[in-house]
Amino acid sequence: MKFIDESLIRIEAGDGGNGCVSFRREKFIPKGGPDGGDGGDGGDVYLQADENLNTLIDYRFNKRFAAERGENGRSSDCTGRRGKDIILPVPVGTRAIDNDTKETLGDLTQHGQKMLVAKGGYHGLGNTRFKSSVNRAPRQKTMGTPGEKRDLLLELMLLADVGMLGLPNAGKSTFIRAVSAAKPKVADYPFTTLVPSLGVVKVDDSHSFVVADIPGLIEGAADGAGLGIRFLKHLERCRVLIHLVDIAPIDGSNPADNVAIIESELFQYSEKLSEKPRWLVFNKIDTMSDEEAEERVREITEQLGWEEDYYLISAATRKNVPPLCRDIMDFIIANPREAETQQVAPEEVKFKWEDYHQEQLAGYQFDDDEDWDDDWTEEDDEGIEFIYKP
């Protein structure tokens, strides 16, 4: 299945149903009074996280989703039916962004979590609502308000504890294959990894963590070189970044310069991401003796001014890999996941039409009651005042 981590869709909540102007008509009751019912509220649009999904491919071609409109009110004080909501399933880790305002509406980080992204229109009021001691035959009603409409950008960001960084062919996919059951493609050419992949690393019977592998970065990735930096967003929720460095690049480049390239591209993408805990892990030490590897790493760290701890491993032979995994697990246990971006609960969303009818009724001035025409029918709109026109 093709991996799709971004999709722009159009969502439209349902419009509110209109109120009804009607009067009670019964034998021997010439002036039965108003009995026009309210309309129904428009349907809402929700996103719901589903752990069985891992891509946004369902929204690659199907781009428009609309909730049902509320029904109009009817005579005999009948209220219109509320429009049906629609719930759009998305993978866990999806972020919803208003494409016009760039406002983040919320993140869905748990299975079953639901988020309101477009609220339906408010129902119109029937003429029964306007009756009073001085207006016993009101011919006023309100129209339902339009539902909210958005161009919604869906961004899928993988939920992983550990993120892998490095140039192409640094050995990231080989490392994933060595520590987990994941089997990303491994080959002797750059950009073998084209899309992010996840692997679950089981340290012991009761402890495990998730590691994310993304396509390699090259110099100029921030300007679109290579595969660009679009996949770096998948590292935003990681607790620690593992910077895998080829200790003996086949092209003869300086590993210290390669580290600096990744640091620069990371900073250009996001200063916050560049400040995440980052460990240097030197790979492919099996290509030289232990003494030569230690000497080369010492030179690299001196050039970088690196004063933190570092690791020397061989992902191909799994040399020194288990101790690294145990240290990662200890770090994860000691540093619980930070709270995700504040979620927008449906009850906290303030819709623009929320106080519309209260304001209309509070400011409406009723005229003195006048005799009304017995020949008036529901089909006759003459004399009807529309409080709101969309």
Curated annotation (Swiss-Prot):
Gene3D superfamilies: GTP1/OBG domain (2.70.210.12), P-loop containing nucleotide triphosphate hydrolases (3.40.50.300). GO terms for cellular component: cytoplasm. Mg(2+) binds at residues 173, 193. The keyword Transmembrane helix does not apply. The keyword Cytoplasm applies. Keywords: Cytoplasm, GTP-binding, Hydrolase, Magnesium, Metal-binding, Nucleotide-binding. Its cofactor is Mg(2+). It is an enzyme of class 3 (hydrolase). Residues 1-159 form the Obg domain. Residues 160-333 form the OBG-type G domain. GO terms for biological process: ribosome biogenesis. One of its GO terms (molecular function) is magnesium ion binding. Signal peptide: none annotated. GTP binds at residues 166-173, 191-195, 213-216, 283-286, 314-316. It is found in: Cytoplasm. Its EC number is 3.6.5.-. InterPro entries: G_OBG, GTP-bd, GTP-bd_Obg/CgtA, GTP1-OBG_CS, GTP1_OBG_dom, GTP1_OBG_dom_sf, OBG_GTPase, P-loop_NTPase. Monomer. Belongs to the TRAFAC class OBG-HflX-like GTPase superfamily. OBG GTPase family. NCBIfam families: Obg_CgtA, PRK12297.1, PRK12299.1. An essential GTPase which binds GTP, GDP and possibly (p)ppGpp with moderate affinity, with high nucleotide exchange rates and a fairly low GTP hydrolysis rate. Plays a role in control of the cell cycle, stress response, ribosome biogenesis and in those bacteria that undergo differentiation, in morphogenesis control. This is GTPase Obg. It comes from Haemophilus influenzae (strain 86-028NP). The gene is obg.
